[in-house]
Amino acid sequence: MXECKGYLELXRSXXHDFIYPLIFQEYIYALAHDRGLNRSIFFENAXYDNKSSLLIVKRLITHLIXQMYXQNHFLFYTNNFXPDPFGGYXTGVXSXMIFEGFGVVVEIPFYLRLLSFLEGKERVKSHNLRSLHSIFPFLEXXXXXXXXXXXXXXXXXXXXXXXXXXXXXXXXXXXXXXXIRFFLHEYPNRNSLITPKKYSFSFSKRNKKFFLFLYNFHVYEYESIFVFLRNQSSHLCSISFETFLERILFYKKIELEVFAKHFKAILWVFKDPFLHYVRYRGKFILASKGSSLLMNKWEYYLVNFWKCYFYIWAQPRRIHIKQLSKNSLDFLGYLSNVRLKPSMVRSQMIENSFLIENAGKKLDTLVPITSMIGSLSKAKFCNVLGHPMNKPVWGGLSDSXIMERIRAXIXKSSHYYSXSLKKISLYXIKYILRLPGAKTLARKHKITVRSFLKRLGVGLLEEFFTEEEQVFYLTFPKASSTSRKLYQRRVWYLDIFYINDTPNHE
């Protein structure tokens, strides 16, 4: 077991830049889509270039470490006034700022590595890592060949100290690892950092940067090993988890030492090349072309994998296995299932002609417009039937503020429909969102909607409300080893926390 764990040890060299985009995938996608690379998501009021950031990071780390060891550690208290390690007294807000500052320090090096890699590189769509905009190609192209899907909630560490252990093991500086442990043990809210909430995780509003970093690192550790084991799915017939790992190590030795040329091709026949993995908001989905028996083995394996390797207890009933041909898959607010569509193929042999009926699969991706209308009706954009209404609460706002709110609401919906070819639901939602703004502005100026549109200009209003989003694709460096390139196949990283959510999650 120890040798197998050593074999699965991840490459944590600073030269492998591909590790860091995986750790901060949520930040990177939000940065690319919502902010742009010229504006940092970590610093709202400041911009850091490559020349000054390194000096800033070194100063912050030196200052934090020096204060921690020079004045008998930081002192955090829940009362209003607490001893300040910088001298005098400080409020709880100052302590939170120090804690948040440490999270920023941890994030800066990863952000700089991404910028240094993107400089001078052509921005193309990556085939290893996919953004949220590729969810429809994933459903329409990849899941169409799948037969069964398993949906489960991603297991989180029971205590934040367990998540910090993985990050501390990968930290290069021992002082940084000691500072991470110190913050976890000294901060008063450490017992309520991550709280489960409807298959997602709500982080502390005061310190979400640092703990989101720990959570991402924990999930990345799990996914990195999972990608490797996914390629060994042919050995899932083993009953015991320990036996499963031992057989992986055994076959790897044979593949590398004895049958380096032939055994690999033999193993590939028994593997499932159509196993897809998707994670979003603390929930992940496994889609496979295999039978339900294979998915049951994956269910048994995942529970034991979390328990034995990560010391996390997961209940099997939280894993749901569905047949795509019989059940619909609810993911990202969409309903998708594979339906059998009969097709007629006419063939002719010599003089006799006959008909052959072949059953083909067709993936139907539907947007539940009913639930979206229900959410908009609760927000007073329309009634339960979808008829737009004016917003009296916006009457005191300026015209530009009203238009900006409508534009923001449209952008939330457009972000999730931007990659879909079936945009009928999107057009309906845009219609519902536009008219309340027009009605509110017309009522504010005491004129009709038609007169208001004529005064403003339909073209200007249409251009303002329907401005298309710019889809930005990132390209990430690949690993140097051929094996890791193989392990990254068909893994879709879609777990995004900072991009605006759909209206029903507000």
Swiss-Prot record:
The lineage of its organism: Eukaryota, Viridiplantae, Streptophyta, Embryophyta, Tracheophyta. Belongs to the intron maturase 2 family. MatK subfamily. Usually encoded in the trnK tRNA gene intron. Probably assists in splicing its own and other chloroplast group II introns. GO terms for biological process: mRNA processing; RNA splicing; tRNA processing. This is Maturase K. InterPro entries: Domain_X (IPR024937), Maturase_MatK (IPR002866), Maturase_MatK_N (IPR024942). One of its GO terms (cellular component) is chloroplast. Keywords: Chloroplast, mRNA processing, Plastid, RNA-binding, tRNA processing. GO terms for molecular function: RNA binding. It is found in: Plastid, Chloroplast. It comes from Andromeda polifolia. It comes from the Eukaryota. The gene is matK.
